[in-house]
């Protein structure tokens, strides 16, 4: 693996946040300019915006959610990229919701190849949203988590137009209190198959630090899953805050370098024009 040499361990915090949301996402009001200026002030060299696009997301109060205005999005960020080209490298990405029912649209997305990066994520489980309490009422919490992981494997069989799978154990953020104490070992075999499939498809995973602000003890996915991914031969691994407000940009990136090293990595990944670049820790 060819790995770009950087100036030291601390540089991992100053390279790129690869998962950021702005006013182009239905659940954020953040102005991208605020994020860019903050990144520059912190010494970041790269930044990648990844606003939501979730086909067939459930309506909220009668409004369509997470339907990205792609032409306007590209136009805006291409202009922003040009404006800041001498200060920071702005990459344009999307966080794409994956489901079998929308696979054709996912696979045809960005046919003109204007994006640098696509995160594929499971926000919905066969069309249902684990964010809402009623999602958890149909079966036991443990069985619901199993269904979530089964849906990821199903998504991998039909959705191919993405670069890394986002926040792999995302479901753990929303398990109702006093229902089931999440333990990834309960799903070890299935997670192993998921990771092997991701690797076989030449894709990667992300370390998403947003879980820490939800009170979780580790980023998503946890260290053990990241280590399993490495031990199975996984190479592509990005780092993202999943920030929806500028104050969470690069949130808790201080824990990431040690986490990746403990998992066996000596680098992490950024994407440019859908191609991975490897940055030494």
Please report, for each region that a protein language model flagged, where it lies by residue.
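Single conserved hydrophobic/aromatic residue that forms the stacking wall/gate
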Residues: 1-13
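An N-terminally biased module of ancient metal coordination in phosphate/nucleic-acid-related enzymes
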Residues: 11-103, 109-112, 174-185, 209, ...
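Short loop/turn motifs at secondary-structure junctions
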Residues: 8, 43, 114, 160-161, ...
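Extended substrate/RNA-proximal surfaces in nucleic-acid metabolism proteins
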Residues: 60-63, 67-200
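Conserved residues at the C-terminal ends of beta-strands
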Residues: 50, 121, 168, 208, ...
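Charged catalytic cores and adjacent phosphate/nucleic-acid-binding surfaces used
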Residues: 11-22, 32, 126, 178-281
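Structural preference for beta-strand elements that scaffold enzyme active sites
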Residues: 15-17, 46-48, 89-93, 116-119, ...
């Amino acid at each position: 693996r060819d790995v770009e040499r950087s100036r030291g361990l601390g540089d991992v915090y100053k390279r790129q946040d690869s998962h950021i949301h702005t006013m182009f996402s239905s659940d954020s009001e953040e102005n991208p300019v605020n994020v860019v200026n903050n990144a520059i002030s912190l010494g970041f060299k790269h930044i990648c915006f990844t606003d939501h696009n979730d086909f067939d997301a459930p309506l909220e109060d009668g409004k369509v959610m997470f339907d990205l205005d792609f032409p306007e999005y590209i136009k805006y960020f291409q202009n922003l990229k040009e404006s800041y080209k001498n200060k920071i490298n702005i990459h344009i990405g999307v966080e794409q919701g994956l489901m079998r029912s929308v696979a054709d649209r996912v696979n045809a997305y960005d046919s003109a190849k204007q994006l640098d990066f696509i995160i594929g994520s499971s926000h919905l489980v066969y069309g249902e949203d684990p964010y809402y309490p009623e999602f958890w009422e149909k079966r036991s919490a443990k069985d619901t988590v199993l269904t979530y992981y089964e849906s990821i494997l199903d998504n991998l069989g039909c959705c191919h137009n993405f670069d890394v799978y986002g926040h792999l154990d995302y479901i753990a953020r929303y398990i109702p209190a006093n229902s089931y104490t999440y333990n990834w070992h309960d799903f070890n075999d299935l997670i192993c198959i998921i990771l092997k499939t991701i690797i076989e498809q030449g894709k990667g995973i992300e370390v998403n630090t947003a879980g820490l602000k939800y009170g979780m003890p580790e980023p998503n996915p946890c260290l053990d899953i990241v280590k399993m991914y490495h031990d199975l031969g996984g190479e592509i691994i990005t780092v993202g805050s999943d920030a929806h407000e500028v104050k969470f940009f690069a949130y808790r990136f201080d824990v990431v370098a040690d986490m990746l090293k403990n998992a066996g990595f000596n680098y992490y990944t950024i994407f440019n024009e859908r191609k991975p670049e490897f940055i030494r820790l």
